[in-house]
A protein has these predicted regions:
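Glycine-rich flexible loops
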Residues: 1-119
């Protein structure tokens, strides 16, 4: 997932493994500003994550992960075990996504009906 973060790309929902755990693309945040980086970096990272979900109208309970641009992935859950599980699934989806994009660069998102069926 760090590869997607470094590239500044959302991780699209291309398959049912993704849809079983995440309701749509996993967003990548915007670049952090110089002020955010030089200020309270950890706090500002959290703020950028929150703003990403708010500005895109996303529900963090439905997409329990984010990619922080030029940094890496963050995942959460109902408890520590759930957060770790979501992080593992995120890594697997990112791995599969990389190959999917290589094989089919113009691959569209999965059908909304299939996303809804699996989520």
């Amino acid at each position: 997932a760090t590869i997607w973060s470094q590239a500044g790309l959302d991780l699209p929902a291309w398959g049912t493994t993704h849809a079983d755990y995440f309701y749509g693309a996993i967003p990548c945040t915007r670049l952090m500003t110089v002020e955010e980086i030089n200020g309270e970096y950890e706090y500002q990272t959290g703020e950028v994550i929150i703003k990403t979900f708010e500005e895109r109208g996303l529900d963090p309970a439905q997409i329990p992960a984010v990619l922080v641009h030029s940094h890496g992935p963050f995942a959460w859950g109902k408890n520590a075990a759930d957060a770790v599980h979501n992080a593992v699934v995120l890594e697997e989806c990112a791995y599969m996504g990389l190959f999917s994009r290589q094989l089919a660069p113009q691959l569209p998102d999965m059908q909304p009906e299939l996303l809804n069926k699996h989520y």
